[in-house]
């Protein structure tokens, strides 16, 4: 049985799952759909047309699904936000709804961990197992692949794509696309190395060795796109193919590789 505090506002048309807890002074808008075992803590606001998956927690004063911060937005569609299962949305996070320039929805996959004061703008698409540290700021239409981590105080420019398994260091500023499985750092951020910490959590030594060799071929000799084309023709590794296809399909470009300074 769900528990809804008397001071909370749940508008007509909202669908509330089983064993949901809605704390004092929180708000759930019309046509919102709240999954089972969700906790909405004091003062959080879930706007209309937001879907939140089972076992998620929305912490105090987070605002999910308010209108886009886009000067061209004219209420032209009934937009919203879709969040997967087991999400953690911490205090004062803001997640804006989508626009007609996308499909109308800002989307976040399963197992998201979004730390306090982070911002996810309209039409962003976040995969599964995403971590945003405090004050990470995503502009409109940003895409993050599965298992990506964005460090604190890091802004990401609109339309940037970050591939699967990347690490974006804290206090960086990202304006170009980041190849899957890489670590990027700096202002402006550039690719520095493979994200070896992330790779070791998911892959065996053989696959990591293949990706390490791929990284050297792609970034340390010749033309990046030519290298990607050549590797694509010869590799059987699905992860290498992901890296190569990403390079060939980039629209914002790949930031120039810089050797890490170990001094």
Curated annotation (Swiss-Prot):
Its EC number is 2.3.1.129. It catalyses: a (3R)-hydroxyacyl-[ACP] + UDP-N-acetyl-alpha-D-glucosamine = a UDP-3-O-[(3R)-3-hydroxyacyl]-N-acetyl-alpha-D-glucosamine + holo-[ACP]. Pathway: Glycolipid biosynthesis; lipid IV(A) biosynthesis; lipid IV(A) from (3R)-3-hydroxytetradecanoyl-[acyl-carrier-protein] and UDP-N-acetyl-alpha-D-glucosamine: step 1/6. The keyword Lipid biosynthesis applies. GO terms for molecular function: acyl-[acyl-carrier-protein]-UDP-N-acetylglucosamine O-acyltransferase activity. InterPro entries: Acetyltransf_C (IPR029098), Acetyltransf_C_sf (IPR037157), Hexapep (IPR001451), Hexapep_transf_CS (IPR018357), Lipid_A_LpxA (IPR010137), Trimer_LpxA-like_sf (IPR011004). GO terms for cellular component: cytoplasm; membrane. One of its GO terms (biological process) is lipid A biosynthetic process. It is found in: Cytoplasm. It is an enzyme of class 2 (transferase). Keywords: Acyltransferase, Cytoplasm, Lipid A biosynthesis, Lipid biosynthesis, Lipid metabolism, Repeat, Transferase. Homotrimer. Involved in the biosynthesis of lipid A, a phosphorylated glycolipid that anchors the lipopolysaccharide to the outer membrane of the cell. Belongs to the transferase hexapeptide repeat family. LpxA subfamily. This is Acyl-[acyl-carrier-protein]--UDP-N-acetylglucosamine O-acyltransferase. It comes from Campylobacter lari (strain RM2100 / D67 / ATCC BAA-1060).
